[in-house]
Curated annotation (Swiss-Prot):
This is Alanine--tRNA ligase. The gene is alaS. The lineage of its organism: Bacteria, Pseudomonadati, Pseudomonadota, Gammaproteobacteria, Aeromonadales. Binds 1 zinc ion per subunit. GO terms for molecular function: alanine-tRNA ligase activity; aminoacyl-tRNA deacylase activity; ATP binding; tRNA binding; zinc ion binding. It catalyses: tRNA(Ala) + L-alanine + ATP = L-alanyl-tRNA(Ala) + AMP + diphosphate. It comes from Aeromonas hydrophila subsp. hydrophila (strain ATCC 7966 / DSM 30187 / BCRC 13018 / CCUG 14551 / JCM 1027 / KCTC 2358 / NCIMB 9240 / NCTC 8049). CDD domains: AlaRS_core.
Length: 874
């Protein structure tokens, strides 16, 4: 019985709905609150906390069709996609789950009922496996379901350790685990392969279609198994695999949804070979890429974004291999949305964004793709008998041409050649070391000073503190005291000075002692100690002395305003551009702030104005800015935004600005958003692929900036004899007039060139009966030379012309040959003859060529050589 992929998905969910299960929508491909996972890769991911007892749902039976990605991380099918019948980066996992409700008997009967009654698969084509010691499951299959014993296979510990088996599932080294039973479909003896557990089990005859996991134990640290108080069930069946069976095909790529994508891809790139493996790759990759972007992942050079970038670039490379000459990949997203319209509401809603992101990423990559492939072809041609591409070549392709290592591996795999992965990793480590060294400006106190001391920070509540000097260092040497003029770093018992971290620069101020002042120019961290950099401005200072630490309050306030506005800006960017925006870095100073964020294209002027408006609205709302210490998980549950890649303590500081922004942050902030006063973006630019940078000012600095802009506008208005309200029209008038004058100048030059050409005709000589003109001119530019050449050739009808002009250390040359003589004399050869003698080079067509040089003094002799050269050829 044929069923479409969509019909199978619907039938599965409706079957389990009828069995009392709650139909739960697919969760995002980006796992929430699970840092152990790169992507959602199984149906149970969204229920993990339920299985662990940390979450409780209103239902105890659930069913889903979960979108999954397996690329990068522990589960990575990327390198096999396109080369096998069943590997994918993206697939749908059909599943039914019991949270302490039914167990083995019902789970087995549900699975068998769906396969044999709803899908009507022949029972004789089905074979099952159970864990070797799971007699309960074996008996249910044989005695209650009626599967013959010879079609039930016991699988023991086949992975080298107790409970390490294809038929024993575990969430980790400890925790919930249990045996599983798997259902296989027998394609028939005309397909090579053996039963599960046999030496030929890797063949394609018996294909696993459903895995039913019985979570009944809690594995302890010592390896012992304790029964779970509420055994549960987790099942998974690949939609693509069961669709292949129901549609009577052997490869997943032959099912309806893949065939539609393959045909569309073939149409776009212009190929008729529908069996080409590259079409399989493209059809698979558009599914993972489109849904990842729809779920908020953007191409980048780290984490999930880098996996997405690798998949996109692999697809683009296969498109070029098929002959694509223009960007094509993004055009498949609409076809995918149409094919999966029943379950792709998120993709359909985000389709314009998805297409734009994929198009921009492809456009960026194709600029270097062809050059990288040429380099790789050159390396392959000179590889000889070697079967491995050197690591330094793989690194160069990555670093210079944007080739992920697995893309290079994919290219050379087609030649049965591998890559030196260890060599590549070594080159990457060298690059990281170089980057670290290059970024270490000034003194690295973390390296210099190994201080076993944690400085309490009191600066959230006060800007002055009576405290004691516990350490004075000049370089790496601890000293007992300082005199006027000494530069040093000082460690205090406790301090109100904020040390540079989280993008916020360190405080400055003074340390006052009875007979001296130490000027603090910067505050940084050395381990957990806070150190105060500066110099002894007056008097002396000794270790152990009591000092009054005074932070520069005006500077701290300016920094606080700029830090607070980064939070508002982050929220505004997510509102204006999309939830994919995340902070990539920041620099919060007293004069201005800088904010780096993930986004795939430059912001338009209208979008910049929109972001400014959103931020200034929140400033005018004058929200109270509150801080609270919370448990990390509680903070995340409360909606606090954590920065990707940042390490946080168990207790974190949560900064709230009304209902608009909630972030984890250890920096200093204003008391209310209104204190910021005014926010103005002064620059927006790209700093890396997929990363944008905004520079902005606040408060008085923003007002000063607007005054400067106003002054410049007034000055410009005066220059064009207008005012600030009509300056654009006035500038337009000036530009229009300038263009008109340029046209008149060009016309005048053309007339002068024609006149000069007529004057030059008097210098024409004959060589072997052919007209020849070789002349040096004063003050003519290259464009004028071209006009003169055309006029002279028209006047001469037949002949050879070489003109030269020089000035300011440069030489311009042009040669022309009428068509009847290009068989004897080539303009390109002639102009190069002269160019080589005047320190230059050039080229062009047989009838016209241009060149440049750097030795004006050599022009006369070079022109003299032309006559003898022509005599040999005419």
């Amino acid at each position: 019985m044929y069923m479409s992929t969509s019909e199978i998905r619907t039938a599965f969910l409706e079957y389990f709905r009828s069995q009392g299960h709650q139909v739960v929508s697919s969760s995002s491909l980006v796992p929430h609150n699970d840092p152990t996972l790169l992507f959602t890769n199984a149906g149970m991911n969204q229920f993990k906390d339920v299985f662990l007892g940390a979450d409780k749902r209103a239902y105890n039976r659930a069913t889903t069709s979960q979108r999954c990605v397996r690329a990068g991380g522990k589960h990575n099918d990327l390198e096999n996609v396109g080369y096998t019948a069943r590997h994918h980066t993206f697939f749908e996992m059909l599943g039914n789950f019991s949270f302490g409700d039914y167990f083995k008997q019902d789970a087995i009967k549900f699975a068998w009922g769906f396969l044999t009654e709803v899908l009507q698969l022949p029972k004789e084509r089905l074979l099952v496996t159970v864990y070797a010691t799971d007699d309960e499951a074996f008996d249910i299959w044989e005695k209650e379901v009626g599967v013959p014993a010879d079609r039930i296979v016991r699988i023991g510990d086949n992975k080298g350790a107790p409970y390490a088996s294809d038929n024993f599932w575990a969430m980790g080294d400890t925790g919930p685990c249990g045996p599983c039973t798997e259902i296989f479909y027998d394609h028939g003896d005309h397909i090579w392969g053996g039963r599960p557990g046999s030496p030929e089990e890797d063949g394609d005859r018996f294909i696993e279609i459903w895995n039913v996991v019985f979570m009944q134990f809690n594995r302890q640290a010592d390896g012992t198994m304790e029964p779970l108080p509420r055994p549960s069930v987790d099942t998974g069946m690949g939609l693509e695999r069961i669709s292949a069976i129901m549609q009577g095909v052997h490869s997943n790529y032959e099912i309806d949804i893949f065939q539609a994508l393959i045909k569309k891809a073939a149409e776009i790139v212009g190929t008729s070979d529908l069996s080409n493996q590259s079409l399989r790759v493209i059809a698979d990759h558009i599914r993972s890429c489109a849904f990842l972007v729809a779920d908020g992942v953007m191409p980048s050079n780290e984490g999930r974004g880098y996996v997405l970038r690798r998949i996109i670039r692999r697809a683009v490379r296969h498109g070029r291999k098929l002959g694509a000459t223009e960007v094509f990949f993004y055009k498949l997203a609409a076809e995918l949305a149409a094919q999966m319209k029943d379950v792709a509401a998120e993709l359909i809603a985000q389709l314009p964004l998805v297409e734009r992101v994929l198009r921009i990423e492809e456009e960026q990559f194709v600029r270097t793709l062809d050059r990288g492939l040429l380099l790789l072809e050159d390396v392959l041609a000179n590889l000889g008998d070697a079967k491995v591409i050197p690591g330094e070549v793989v690194f160069k392709l990555y670093d210079t041409y944007g080739f992920p290592a697995d893309l290079t591996a994919d290219v050379v795999r087609e030649r049965e050649i591998g890559i030196d992965e260890e060599g590549f990793k070594a080159e990457m480590e060298k690059q990281r070391a170089r980057a670290k060294e290059a970024s270490s400006f000034g003194v690295n106190y973390n390296e210099m000073l190994k201080l076993d001391f944690e400085t309490p920070f009191t600066g959230y509540k006060t800007l002055t503190e009576r405290t004691r000097v516990v350490g004075i260092y000049k370089g790496v040497d601890e000293v007992s005291g300082l005199i006027a003029g000494d530069e040093a770093v000082i460690v205090l018992e406790q301090t109100p000075f904020y040390a540079e971290s989280g993008g916020q620069i360190g405080d400055s101020g003074t340390l006052k002692v009875d007979d001296g002042i130490f000027a603090v120019t910067d505050t940084v961290k050395a381990g957990k100690a806070i150190i105060h950099k500066g110099y002894m401005e007056l008097g002396t200072l000794e270790k152990g002395a009591e000092v009054e630490a005074v932070v520069d309050g005006e500077r701290r306030q300016a920094i606080a305003l700029n830090h607070s506005v980064t939070h508002l800006l982050h929220a505004a960017l997510r509102q204006a551009l999309g939830e994919h925006v995340t902070q990539k870095g920041s620099l919060v100073g007293a004069e201005r702030m800088r904010f780096d964020f993930s986004h795939f294209e430059g912001m338009t002027m209208a979008t910049i104005r929109r972001v400014e408006e959103l931020v200034n609205n929140q400033i005018r709302a004058n929200h109270e800015i509150t801080t609270q210490l919370m448990d990390l998980e509680a903070a995340k549950s409360a909606g606090a935004m954590a920065l990707f890649g940042e390490k946080y303590e168990d207790d974190v500081r949560v900064v709230r600005m009304g209902d608009y922004s909630t972030e984890l942050c250890g920096g200093t902030h204003a008391k209310r958003t209104g204190d910021i006063g005014f926010f103005k973006i002064i620059a927006e630019s790209g700093i890396a692929a997929g990363v944008r940078r905004i520079e902005a000012v606040t408060g008085k600095a923003a007002i000063d900036f607007m005054h400067q802009v106003g002054e410049q506008i007034e000055e410009a208005a005066a220059l064009v004899k207008g005012d600030q309200f009509c300056i654009a029209d006035k500038v337009r008038q000036v530009l229009d007039k300038a263009k008109m004058m340029e046209r008149e100048l060009e016309q005048l030059k053309a007339k002068l060139a024609a006149q000069a050409g007529n004057d030059l005709l008097g210098q024409v000589i004959e060589i072997k009966g052919q007209k020849v003109l070789v002349a040096a001119l004063e003050g003519a530019d290259p464009k004028s030379l071209r006009g003169m050449l055309d006029e002279l050739k028209n006047q001469m009808k037949s002949g050879v012309v070489l003109l030269a002009t020089s000035g300011e250390g440069k030489v311009n040359l042009i040669a022309g040959v009428t068509n009847d003589l290009t068989g004897k004399v080539k303009a390109g050869e002639l102009v190069n003859l002269v160019a080589q003698q005047v320190g230059g080079k050039g080229g062009g067509r047989p009838d016209m060529a241009q060149a440049g040089g750097t030795q004006p003094e050599a022009v006369p002799a070079a022109l003299q050589s032309v006559h003898s050269w022509l005599e040999e050829r005419l």
